[in-house]
Amino acid sequence: MAKLKLTITTPSAIFYDDLVDIVTLRVNLGYKGFLPNASEFFSNIEPGTLTINYENSSDMIKCHIGSGLIYSNKESVNIITDDIVKIEDINLDALNKQKEMLENRLKENLRESLLKQVEEKLENINSRIKAYNEFKK
């Protein structure tokens, strides 16, 4: 079976660099799976679950990814992001503490620009919590 070269790069390191069967993640039109020999594709990444390989395979990896960029062609998928974590490595207690702190910040009288930053951080944390809960079912 044909394989696809997946490279996930963050500002500090290469998060993943190997051959895979499929990569699935959320783009602006919804979730999309990337397979070998597919047409070229370029898009922003929406926060959500990134799945490497097929759901029930022994080498499946689930991650939570924040925003980023994806470019794919027939042979490879390249992802650039500054926010990715394996779901199994998510610390739910720490996320819930951060969520509570941000929700308390929202009750303050914040400048509009700061309010937007807090809302975006809270949205990202809620997305990670959702991904964790779906993975742990």
Swiss-Prot record:
UniProt keyword annotation of Glycoprotein present: no
Domain of life from the UniProt record: Bacteria
Entry's Gene Ontology cellular component terms: plasma membrane; proton-transporting ATP synthase complex
Subcellular compartments: Cell membrane
Subunit architecture: F-type ATPases have 2 components, CF(1) - the catalytic core - and CF(0) - the membrane proton channel. CF(1) has five subunits: alpha(3), beta(3), gamma(1), delta(1), epsilon(1). CF(0) has three main subunits: a, b and c.
Family: Belongs to the ATPase epsilon chain family.
Protein name, per record: ATP synthase epsilon chain
Organism field: Mycoplasmopsis synoviae (strain 53)
Gene name as annotated: atpC
